[in-house]
Amino acid sequence: MAHRILRDHEADGWERSDFPIICESCLGDNPYVRMTKANYDKECKICTRPFTVFRWRPGRDARYKKTEVCQTCCKLKNVCQVCLLDLEYGLPVQVRDTALNISTHDSIPKSDVNREFFAEEHDRKTRAGLDYESSFGKIRPNDTIRMLQRTTPYYKRNRAHICSFFIRGECTRGDECPYRHEMPETGELSQQNIKDRYYGVNDPVALKLLGKAGEMGTLESPEDQSIRTLYVGGLNSRVLEQDIRDQFYAHGEIESIRILAEKACAFVTYTTREGAEKAAEELSNRLVVNGQRLKLTWGRPQVPKPDQDGSNQQGSVAHSGLLPRAVISQQQNQPPPMLQYYMHPPPPQPPHQDRPFYPSMDPQRMGAVSSSKESGSSTSDNRGASSSSYTMPPHGHYPQHQPYPPPSYGGYMQPPYQQYPPYHHGHSQQADHDYPQQPGPGSRPNPPHPSSVSAPPPDSVSAAPSGSSQQSADAAVTTGSSQ
């Protein structure tokens, strides 16, 4: 506070506000914040004038934070009232002023009387309705600002302070201690001053960031001239394909954009190598899309997969269904199929080859036997015929043309024989008696087979007419003689 003692707070320039000017990182990630307000509670650490102090807790595991400087000093430098970092870029004042070539070190007085007069003039212009804007918002950011600016909040700096009793080994609170039980880091960053941060002089954090910016270089183009793809990493749900296209289209014509959401990356392919080199040079270390900093590097060509052994390809057999292990091993051990003469195409496969074969379809499985000798003989004949050539067509259907010899199965399993023999002229009468057909609804029954109709024995049939004729002849002779 000034050396003069005034009873009028408004005339003295004491600050009274309703809400602080703070950055998003200091406010915290919790949208519901309980904040306390104390008018004229502390004096500003820059101008030493009393101001309204706000105090809140930005998170569950964070420490309580409060405003350190008044809003007048905050507006002069466009910084946060708590961390004294730039409100727009999140950088220290020294880094921002160096990158934008701004010299404000001599514009703010340092003596008590001059500081008070300077602050009163600034407050008077604000009350008069003048739109007082600093030159920070009118200057466009350059490459250094884009490389170093913070695009997302950094809540880690809201953690609790280190417990001093733990450092000496005397803390008895254990897990209930509200401070961190860690050893402090020693170095230049541990020696920070709030006034040096505000004026931008000898700030160790700013010197570290400026040194990091000088070490950043451009991307080196690969020697392979066929590479025209750029890798973009660090994507999130807010970055869409159209946003990436708008950012890269200004440097050349784009051939394709491939986004891998599960890996949070994208690949941008240009039609020419010159467009890819121009984009890599202009956007290296300064690619920001929708407020998200992205990583940009050259894409690597995909390594071709090693070819499989040719012997394994020839020995592999595709199965349309589940086959027994013995059958699979037998098929895999068979030699490759023979080529046809004169390079003819292979013959067509039979229609039942694509049908899946299951172990339960084998009639000889689980000890099944034939019902009769005749059916067994006919089944064995049909089995031999099917194994030698192919299945006989149904009755009345014959192939029209056979341009090729009987097909060879080419290392595949022969088709399974039919459980029942097909119908043809040479079928036995026993099959008709063993497998009668039931008439369906609305169909007329078939007439019985001539061989199946029951008839009397031949002797009885021929004896009946002969006996009756003999009796009639004897009767005729007796009648004649009597007459």
From Swiss-Prot:
Listed SMART domains: RRM (SM00360), ZnF_C3H1 (SM00356)
One Gene Ontology MF term: DNA binding
Source taxon at top rank: Eukaryota
Biased composition regions of type Low complexity, renumbered to the chain: 370-380, 392-401, 409-423, 460-476
Xref: Gene3D superfamilies: 3.30.70.330, Zinc finger, CCCH-type
Keywords in alphabetical order: DNA-binding, Metal-binding, RNA-binding, Zinc, Zinc-finger
Bias kind Polar residues: ranges: 381-391
Zinc finger (C3H1-type): 157-184
Record's compositionally biased regions (Pro residues): 336-351, 438-459
Chain positions covered by the region annotation Disordered: 298-317, 336-483
Key word Transmembrane helix present: no
Name recorded for this polypeptide: Zinc finger CCCH domain-containing protein 25
